[in-house]
Amino acid sequence: MNSSKSLRIVFAGTSQFSYEFLYALLESRHVVVGILANPDRFSGRGHKIKFSPVKKLAKYYNIKILQPDSTESLDNLENDLKKMRCDIIIVVSYSIILSKKILSLPRLGCINLHSSLLPRWRGAAPIHRALQSGDKTTGITIIKMNDEIDTGPILYKRVCSIQDTDTTETLLNKLSIIGKAAIIQLLHQISIGKYNLQYQNNSIATYAKKINKKEAKINWNLPAINIDRNIRAFNPWPVSYFWISGKYIRAWKAKIDINNIFISDPGKILNVNSDGIHVGTGKGILILEVLQLSGKKRSFVKESLCLYKKLFITGNIIQ
């Protein structure tokens, strides 16, 4: 029986999603010897330095952190990485592209956990695009990295169903759970040399382009089902929005009126009640349930019904 060996890992990531994987690795038998994270950001009126979730965790565990701001600056850190003597680099939600030079450093190569079932939704926003497209399933794919984006051979894949109420936030949570288990299992397989590579079928690949904030403005000419998908895709960022009476409103949650699926009255306020704000679309009625006025906390429409009845007057058109 082959015994699993402890691997020396350099972890590349920045976000809260990445943080969950780093924590799982720190709790495993493997050793995280270095971190690649995005540069610190300045935040708030005081322009204070804001550390990423991954950097905070790395500092707590006293792990060496490298923060290049480009592929070129990462290449310049080649000697620093060599000194770490890592067996493998694990990439989870990291924005800087690794060059051939960096990819060739670890003896076991570099692997990337991607939040889709590759080759579907290669690129920067796979969860958002899966929700917008009405996909019924998504998942995680772990690939052996090459010098192209998300095209490397597949090492591990796990499927996750998408519910009609899922948002990007809820799917990230689901994928984090299955992804952490997958990473640990795959590392065991790699450490004993028992793993398979499956090459991707490029002919069925789709691309998930980066989210632009302008996409979040609600287009009431779309069918209700598409607006609902967008609202869920853009939760928690950049958050769908619209304007009414000169006020900027964020839409966090909505549902489709299944009893009126053929009505076409884009942007028209049809009713305001404890169920929500009923708005006509290109096809069907969308019921806005959770909104956020500028400078206020988000709230259910039914919790602030008097306020919303003054703002959303039946018959008016939302911009």
Curated annotation (Swiss-Prot):
Keywords: Protein biosynthesis, Transferase. One of its GO terms (molecular function) is methionyl-tRNA formyltransferase activity. The keyword Protein biosynthesis applies. It comes from the Bacteria. GO terms for cellular component: cytosol. Disulfide bonds: none annotated. It catalyses: L-methionyl-tRNA(fMet) + (6R)-10-formyltetrahydrofolate = N-formyl-L-methionyl-tRNA(fMet) + (6S)-5,6,7,8-tetrahydrofolate + H(+). (6S)-5,6,7,8-tetrahydrofolate binds at S116, L117, L118, P119. Its EC number is 2.1.2.9. HAMAP family: Formyl_trans. Belongs to the Fmt family. Attaches a formyl group to the free amino group of methionyl-tRNA(fMet). The formyl group appears to play a dual role in the initiator identity of N-formylmethionyl-tRNA by promoting its recognition by IF2 and preventing the misappropriation of this tRNA by the elongation apparatus. This is Methionyl-tRNA formyltransferase. It comes from Wigglesworthia glossinidia brevipalpis. The lineage of its organism: Bacteria, Pseudomonadati, Pseudomonadota, Gammaproteobacteria, Enterobacterales. The gene is fmt.
